[in-house]
Amino acid sequence: MENVFDYEDIQLIPAKCIVNSRSECDTSVRLGGHTFKLPVVPANMQTIIDEKLAISLAENGYFYVMHRFEPETRIDFIKDMNARGLFSSISVGVKDEEYEFVRQLAEENLTPEYVTIDIAHGHSNAVIEMIQHLKKHLPDSFVIAGNVGTPEAVRELENAGADATKVGIGPGKVCITKIKTGFGTGGWQLAALRWCAKAASKPIIADGGIRTHGDIAKSIRFGATMVMIGSLFAGHEESPGQTIEKDGKLYKEYFGSASEFQKGEKKNVEGKKMHVAHKGSIKDTLIEMEQDLQSSISYAGGTKLNAIRNVDYVIVKNSIFNGDKY
C-alpha cells in the first residue's frame, strides 16, 4: 500500500470554473433504480434513522437505509412505504432468522428496492451466502453488502452478486473497533476507499470518518458513489436519539451500532455513546450539504458530480486544520 492518507491530509486542486453560479451545479446521483438529490445517506444506526425520518427523506428525494435493530418491524415498514408509493430500503444481518425473513418476503411478494447486508466484518462467507440467498429469493432487490476495507473483499462480494459494496471498518466517531481490536480503516479511510474503488466494477458507498462537508467531495474524488454519514446527521430535531439538557444546552444521544446501549449488554462491544449538540432541523443540514457540494463541483470545473472525480489533489501530511479544532 503506497500513499496512506485520510480526509484531513488531502486538498483537492481547483480547475477552471465554467458556471456563473454554483446553483447551476447538479449534485444528483443514481443508485439502483432511483436518482437522489445528494450522494449522501444517513447511517443505518438506531440514533440516526427511524421510520418517520425514512419517510421524510424518501418523500424529498434522498436515499436512506433503515437500521436492522428492530427486525420484527421490517415487514410492516416495507408495506407502509409501498402504500405511500415510496421506495423501501432495509438492512439485514446474517443469522439464521434473517434467511427465514428473506424467504418470508419472497412468499409475501414483498420486494424491498434496496437491501443492505450490515455486518461489521463483511469479508466473510456468511455475507457471501446471504448475498446469494437474497439474489435467489429477491432477484429484483438492489443488494448493498458490507462493511469491507480491501480490494479482495470488494471483488469477492461483487462476484457473489452484490450490486454495491460499503467500505469502512471502524473509522466512525462512535466506533471503537480500532481500539478494541487493532484492525480497521480508522486513520486511513480515504486511502482505503481509493484502494477499494480501483478494484470495484460496481458502486461503492464510503462509510465512516466524514467530519466535514468537504469530506463528501473528497470521497467522490476517490471513487465513492454514495457517502454514508453518522455523526454529522446525529443531534437533529428529527434524529431518533433522546434529547438531554445539560447546563441549559440541548444535546442528543448518539451511539455506535455495536455499543452496549444498542445491544443492551456488555458483550463484544465495539461502539460507544456520546452527546451531540442539538443542531435544529435535518432539512437545513441537507440544504447546506447540497450548497457546499455545488461549490465543490464549481471548484472542480464542472456542472455535475463526476467533475470532482477528475481533479488533482495534494497530500498535506501536517493536516489542513493546522491543529485547529474545526
UniProtKB/Swiss-Prot annotation:
NADP(+) binds at residues 204-227. InterPro entries: Aldolase_TIM, GMP_reductase, GuaC_type_2, IMP_DH/GMP_Rdtase_CS, IMP_DH_GMPRt. Induction: Expression is regulated by PurR. SUPFAM superfamilies: Inosine monophosphate dehydrogenase (IMPDH). The keyword Oxidoreductase applies. GO terms for cellular component: GMP reductase complex. Catalyzes the irreversible NADPH-dependent deamination of GMP to IMP. It functions in the conversion of nucleobase, nucleoside and nucleotide derivatives of G to A nucleotides, and in maintaining the intracellular balance of A and G nucleotides. This is GMP reductase. It comes from Bacillus subtilis (strain 168). The gene is guaC.
